[in-house]
From Swiss-Prot:
Gene name per UniProt: AP2B1
Residue list for modification Phosphoserine: 4
Function: Component of the adaptor protein complex 2 (AP-2). Adaptor protein complexes function in protein transport via transport vesicles in different membrane traffic pathways. Adaptor protein complexes are vesicle coat components and appear to be involved in cargo selection and vesicle formation. AP-2 is involved in clathrin-dependent endocytosis in which cargo proteins are incorporated into vesicles surrounded by clathrin (clathrin-coated vesicles, CCVs) which are destined for fusion with the early endosome.
Family: Belongs to the adaptor complexes large subunit family.
Name of this protein: AP-2 complex subunit beta
Topology within the bilayer: Peripheral membrane protein
Keyword Cell membrane among UniProt keywords: yes
Complexes and interactors: adapter protein complex 2 (AP-2) is a heterotetramer composed of two large adaptins (alpha-type subunit AP2A1 or AP2A2 and beta-type subunit AP2B1), a medium adaptin (mu-type subunit AP2M1) and a small adaptin (sigma-type subunit AP2S1). Interacts with EPN1. Interacts with EPS15; clathrin competes with EPS15. Interacts with SNAP91; clathrin competes with SNAP91. Interacts with CLTC; clathrin competes with EPS15, SNAP91 and PIP5K1C. Interacts with LDLRAP1. Interacts with AMPH and BIN1. Interacts with ARF6 (GDP-bound).
Keywords: Acetylation, Cell membrane, Coated pit, Endocytosis, Membrane, Phosphoprotein, Protein transport, Transport
Entry's localization field: Cell membrane; Membrane, Coated pit
Length: 937
């Protein structure tokens, strides 16, 4: 009977029986009992109470039983750290066992037990195993070093294990070399500035030698390591490429992709005119094509990587377009990827084949695939000018099929073709107008309206067509409403005498009957333009439009170079850099392609070093200026020196969906603000009675837990078409977060959320896009924690801590204001030295000192100091003068502004006196509000 019998028991109270069996004298009985325990553990039963009994079974020569006991230990050691110590002696003993399998098993298990108390006992056995005579033990010990480093990095460095790992790179056994490289690479990821691997020509030669004899996963580790090396010149790059090229014919697709990554990177260093360069390009094509004969899942990963390769070097696969033709039994995700690559490889030479394929695809039954195929025909027309006429003819044939979704997608595509080739294919407009009644999708309706408005002078009944859309104006989507408004204004400017009533009707609907601010504002712009200067209006609205680009979905070059360095990893499948989706990856080293002529440090300089130094200097805050003007200048791309956010992530989202011109006239109305942070009365200016600080005692230690303001409703549902947003701000582990709750009180689901901040006093911006990946259903709420940073554009606001926010979803764009409690902007390095504090206090002019009263506070000086230190307000010194406690404190804001404080506490008096001094006195009243909130919380 198989081991499945252990999973079929339904007995109650079996723990007692298992305990007895584990202590049985017979070895077979104990082995059976341990198997039952492991089975119970596997199905989720709590068998932690058997810990001492299972540990007793470690003293055995039976390898199978030992493995089972070790498995149990790994699972329960974290919850029973004190009892896990019992097993240490057995581990140490097993590390010296004659059997290398047992030695390796022991050191591997000790590395998997993530308990601090055990790590100190692991050092000596691990040191022996790293020098063990058996390669199996050495390779296991190498991985154990990486695991131990993750638990206690300092101890690994102090014990010299990193040096031992480096020594293993020269080991005679290739698997030991591979594991040593894997361990060092893993450690390097968390310490990007350390040169742990010390890659030099000698080490590279050792790795290339080991590459031929490794297992497939060992080869992947070594190839990934090689991809991080920057050869000193093109000769060395060519030499490495020659030794890596045989890996392209490996059976394992992961090895192939790792080899492709190395070659793609080193191609940058080879002279393009050389014969070897062209030969290497030819060698890269067959293995990539071979990957497409695997399982669908492997095909998908390969296609996502090929998509990047084609964008970087289309010449590699330009002759292989046929392998990307879709097969009838391909899954939809493979079909869509193949379609994308086909368009990227389309050229004048192969466009006839591509169009024939696409026309065939447009008759398939899968709606999503058909839509993408029709869109692809349009992309071909835009990309290959010589094929445009043939593409338009193909689209007209598809429109004649009268298949609803095909017709609608074709009209959207034809609009783009009109934009690319103005005044060339307008003869087909009559055919398009025949299908007006069948259009029910917003994109298609908007496209048709745009065509009618743009070519109104060529359509006899353009006014009737647009008027038919106007009948259900309020039922249309925002996209259609905005397009219709613009189209009718265009029509009026072309035929003013015939359409005056129509334009007045649409302007009235847009400005008076609509509650959509984008639509209202665009309506007012047109109204004012038409009423003040019709000539200028004509120049603005009917101006010549820029031609649309060939490829609108190309990845931004810098990001593409980084993704090429991550071929074969998740980043290449997501088309996002690792720090965009790996939690806690702020320290991940950004990779870059090397620069030609072998600049050795091209890929080694960490990104963002200038940012760190610039943050130390206080930022100059410009005046607030015109709010509307600044809203027009909202930067929809990412902050240029924020390494955590890629340009594709934030740059791809345009919150102002109706276009930037829709914001003119839009005002932000602050929502209700908690009274806690209401502006205080203007404080009195006083002089200080500060004396010599050198006699003062030291501050108080820190206790956990900073102040978090209570959540407030920032955006009521009545003002946001059913979307309610409440929230607050927090400061955790050195990072600022915007904690929000989104509630859908509407009758329809909400999707496509995005967020944008206006310029503000402290440069606060989101570090990552808003992460709401699933639709928000009616009456559903979701909590979102949005990481923030202070590297954005700066503009002085009134009040100073005011933050203006735009939130977009599939319904509309909504605006609200909230106040940032300044304690979330207090940084961890805000503690001054006492001498510096005294000198700074004296250096700041007396007129910058402001005094406040904190009323009804019943805390002693130690508690006050502790509460404030939890919020990064540091007590520099404390003394008692005539029974009155005096606390001298410092804090620092994210923009580099220092604030010095003197807090006087009289025992028995609930009113405290707070004196604040800083070089930007307008900040002081907000600091007082924070003090008041923290101490009364």
């Amino acid at each position: 009977m198989t081991d499945s019998k252990y999973f079929t028991t339904n007995k109650k109270g079996e723990i007692f029986e298992l305990k007895a069996e584990l202590n049985n004298e017979k070895k077979e009985k104990r082995k059976e009992a341990v198997k039952k325990v492991i089975a119970a553990m596997t199905v989720g039963k709590d068998v932690s109470s058997l810990f001492p009994d299972v540990v007793n079974c470690m003293q055995t020569d039976n390898l199978e039983l030992k493995k089972l006991v070790y498995l149990y230990l790994m699972n329960y050691a974290k919850s029973q750290p004190d009892m896990a110590i019992m097993a240490v002696n057995s581990f140490v003993k097993d590390c010296e066992d004659p059997n290398p399998l047992i030695r390796a098993l022991a050191v591997r298990t000790m590395g998997c037990i993530r308990v601090d108390k055990i790590t100190e006992y692991l050092c000596e056995p691990l040191r022996k195993c790293l020098k063990d005579e058996d390669p199996y033990v050495r390779k296991t010990a190498a991985v154990c070093v990486a695991k131990l480093h993750d638990i206690n990095a300092q101890m690994v460095e102090d014990q010299g294990f990193l040096d031992s790992l480096r020594d293993l790179i020269a080991d005679s056994n290739p698997m030991v070399v591979a594991n040593a490289v894997a361990a060092l690479s893993e450690i390097s990821e968390s310490h990007p500035n350390s040169n742990l691997l010390d890659l030099n020509p000698q080490n590279i030669n050792k790795l290339l030698t080991a590459l031929n004899e490794c297992t497939e996963w060992g080869q992947i580790f070594i190839l990934d390591c090689l991809s991080n090396y920057n050869p000193k010149d093109d000769r060395e790059a060519q030499s490495i490429c020659e030794r890596v090229t045989p890996r392209l014919s490996h059976a394992n697709s992961a090895v192939v992709l790792s080899a492709v990554k190395v070659l793609m990177k080193f191609l940058e260093l080879l002279p393009k005119e050389s014969d070897y360069y062209n030969m290497l390009l030819k060698k890269l094509a067959p293995p990539l094509v071979t990957l497409l004969s695997g399982e669908p899942e492997v095909q998908y990963v390969a296609l996502r990587n090929i998509n990047l390769i084609v964008q970087k070097r289309p010449e590699i696969l330009k002759q292989e377009i046929k392998v990307f033709f879709v097969k009838y039994n391909d899954p939809i995700y493979v079909k869509l990827e193949k379609l994308d690559i086909m368009i990227r490889l389309a050229s004048q030479a192969n466009i006839a084949q591509v169009l024939a394929e696409l026309k065939e695809y447009a008759t398939e039954v899968d709606v999503d695939f058909v839509r993408k195929a029709v869109r692809a025909i349009g992309r071909c027309a835009i990309k290959v000018e010589q094929s445009a006429e043939r593409c338009v003819s193909t689209l007209l044939d598809l429109i004649q099929t009268k298949v609803n979704y095909v017709v609608q997608e074709a009209i959207v595509v034809i609009r783009d073709i009109f934009r690319k080739y103005p005044n060339k294919y307008e003869s087909i407009i009559a055919t398009l107008c025949e299908n007006l009644d069948s259009l029910d999708e917003p994109d298609a309706r908007a496209a048709m309206i745009w065509i009618v408005g743009e070519y109104a002078e060529r359509i006899d009944n353009a006014d009737e067509l647009l008027e038919s859309f106007l009948e259900g104006f309020h039922d249309e989507s925002t996209q259609v409403q905005l397009t219709l408004l613009t189209a009718i204004v265009k029509l009026f400017l072309k035929k003013p005498s015939e359409t005056q009533e129509l334009v007045q009707q649409v302007l009235s609907l847009a400005t008076q009957d609509s509650d959509n601010p984008d639509l209202r504002d665009r309506g007012y712009i047109y109204w004012r333009l038409l009423s003040t200067d019709p000539v200028t209006a004509k120049e603005v609205v009917l101006s010549e439009k820029p031609l649309i680009s060939e490829e609108t979905d190309l990845i931004e070059p810098t990001l593409l170079d980084e993704l090429i360095c991550h071929i074969g990893s998740l980043a290449s499948v997501y088309h996002k850099p690792p720090n965009a989706f790996v939690e806690g990856s702020h320290g991940i080293h950004r990779k870059h392609l090397p620069i030609h002529h072998g600049s050795t440090d091209a890929g080694d300089s960490p990104v963002g070093t200038t940012t760190a130094t610039n943050l130390e200097q206080p930022q100059v805050i410009p005046s607030q200026g015109d709010l509307l003007g600044d809203l027009l200048n909202l930067d929809l791309g990412p902050p240029v020196n924020v390494p955590q956010v890629s340009s594709m992530q934030m740059g791809a989202v345009d919150l102002l969906g109706g276009g930037l011109d829709s914001l003119v006239g839009q005002s932000f109305i602050p929502s209700s603000v908690p009274a806690t942070f209401a502006p205080s009365p203007t404080p009195a200016v006083v002089s200080s009675g500060l004396n010599d600080l050198f006699e003062l005692s030291t501050g108080i230690g820190m206790a956990p837990g900073g102040y978090v303001a209570p959540k407030a409703v920032w955006l009521p549902a009545v003002k946001a078409k059913g979307l309610e947003i409440s929230g607050t701000f927090t400061h955790r582990q050195g990072h600022i977060y915007m904690e929000m709750n989104f509630t859908n009180k509407a009758l329809q689901h909400m999707t496509d959320f995005a967020i944008q901040f206006n310029k503000n006093s402290f440069g606060v911006i989101p570090s990552t896009p808003l992460a709401i990946h699933t639709p928000l259903m009616p009456n559903q709420s979701i909590d979102v924690s949005l990481p923030l940073n202070t590297l954005g554009p700066v503009m002085k606001m009134e009040p100073l801590n005011n933050l203006q926010v735009a939130v977009k979803n599939n319904i509309d764009v909504f605006y609200f204001s909230c106040l940032i409690p300044l304690n979330v902007l207090f940084v961890e390095d805000g503690k001054m030295e006492r001498q510096v504090f005294l000198a700074t206090w004296k250096d700041i002019p007396n007129e910058n000192e402001l005094q406040f009263q904190i009323k009804e506070c019943h805390l002693n000086a130690d508690t006050v100091s502790s509460k404030l230190q939890n919020n990064n307000v540091y007590t520099i010194a404390k003394r008692n003068v005539e029974g009155q406690d005096m606390l001298y404190q410092s804090l620092k804001l994210t923009n580099g502004i220092w604030i010095l404080a003197e807090l006087r506490i009289q025992p028995g008096n609930p009113n405290y006196t707070l004196s604040l001094k800083c070089r930007a006195p307008e900040v002081s009243q907000y600091i007082y509000q924070v003090y008041d909130s923290i101490l009364k919380n």
